[in-house]
Regions:
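Extracytoplasmic/lumenal domain signature
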Residues: 1, 5-78, 82-118, 122-380
Length: 380
């Protein structure tokens, strides 16, 4: 089973690993140095794959941080790559999409897109979904053959999300544009199913969970939309703007225990970073605030800086990072702090989750590995 093979771990962009015990105590295991701010990592079978704002794709040993191979490029590669059984796919700001051997870095194919990539690509089954300036393209992962493309008025914003439903004729893809809209396409032929305007430009791509699409924008609006029709289930608004994609701790994957209530299992929780220094926390039923104060509910959990990196959830722990370089572990139901780690510069790209490891990219040109031992965790 893959650890975290693409942006936020899967084609839905869930950003969660609820089947694992979360880190209630962490230690810094290693750091790896690069040239340029580090992009969004992915990891699979003890190897981390990551690019930088200066270019190149690197394969790093997940245990030691040592370099296994590097593919040189002349353009930025800071979007999350995709790793599969045999290949690694990654794109550049120059509009190139590459497929290389996951073991050696040897190149299989190169695809030139009509414009620079604007987000991480997504893989669903044997196809890649790639957003760029002016549209979205779908190609065969093994060969790079383009199946169809969809023109947009502006640039695709954030990583496209793909999901399937047994009542549909095939999968569907969800994406946003900088023209302040989110849309749904048939994954088979690119036919538009629905389009919904947003109040601002999406902050990161859509997230799909339990039949809903969640999008947050830089105008401070969170929308929960029906995956089939685009109908709005709820709207949550805040002053300022959101600055990360939505992470959903889905209730359908939880069990009632000493820290997870029956209400949590029924409704689930959203976590969204904002430029007001809060991770906003709502339920998935009505979009109500879930963090309680002495007299009134609070908008979320306060951090030291803006939150551009999307939250990731491991078990019952939400892992967060902000623009001051602070990294936190927060209880996902009580919202108390479990741990805190201070890095040397801002964290603006989303971390990756491995086996008992969190890989955090930093703007100080380093990748940090934070590690935990499930047998040496503090009690609940």
């Amino acid at each position: 089973v893959s650890d975290w093979n693409q942006f936020k771990g899967d084609a839905h962009h869930s950003g969660t690993r609820l089947d694992r015990e979360g880190p209630r105590r962490i230690e810094r295991s290693w750091t790896a140095d690069f040239v340029g701010p580090v992009g969004e990592p992915v990891c699979d079978h003890e190897t981390v794959f990551v690019g930088t704002a200066q270019g190149n794709l690197y394969a790093i040993d997940a245990t030691t941080g040592s370099r296994r191979w590097v593919v040189e490029t002349t353009a930025a590669t800071d979007r999350a790559p995709i790793v599969s059984r045999e290949m690694v796919h990654f794109g550049t700001d120059a509009g190139k999409l590459y497929a290389v051997d996951r073991t050696s870095g040897d190149r299989y194919w190169t695809l030139t897109l009509p414009g620079p990539l604007t987000a991480s690509p997504t893989q669903f089954e044997d196809r890649l979904y790639v957003g760029y300036e002016g549209g979205l393209a779908v190609c065969v992962a093994e060969t790079g053959e383009v199946i169809w493309s969809y023109d947009t008025d502006g640039s695709v914003v954030g990583c496209p999300a793909v999901t399937d439903d047994r009542e549909w004729s095939g999968p569907r893809v969800y994406a946003g544009t900088d023209e302040e809209a989110v849309f749904c396409l048939e994954a088979g032929d690119g036919e538009e199913v629905w389009r919904v305007p947003t109040d601002g430009v999406l902050a990161g791509g859509p997230t799909v969970a339990e039949g809903r699409v969640y999008v947050a924008d830089d105008a401070g609006t969170l929308l929960s939309l029906d995956t089939d029709t685009g109908q709005s289930w709820f709207t949550y608004k805040t002053d300022g703007g959101f600055s990360s994609s939505v992470t959903v701790r889905s209730g359908e994957n939880l069990a009632v225990d000493e820290v997870t209530t029956a209400e949590e299992v029924t409704e689930g929780t959203t976590f969204i970073g904002a430029n007001d220094g809060y991770v906003h926390v709502t339920d998935t039923t009505f979009g109500r605030r879930k963090v309680r104060g002495w007299l009134f509910s609070k908008k979320g959990v306060a951090l030291d800086g803006e939150i551009h990196a999307s939250p990731v959830v491991v078990g019952n722990v939400v892992c967060l990072a902000d623009t001051t370089g602070s990294v936190y572990g927060i209880d996902a139901t009580r919202y108390d702090h479990w741990w805190y780690e201070q890095l040397e510069d801002a964290v603006t790209n989303t971390p990756a989750v491995g086996q008992r490891r969190l890989f955090v990219p930093c703007e100080d040109d380093r990748l940090y590995c934070l590690e935990w031992d499930p047998d040496e965790q503090p009690g609940l």
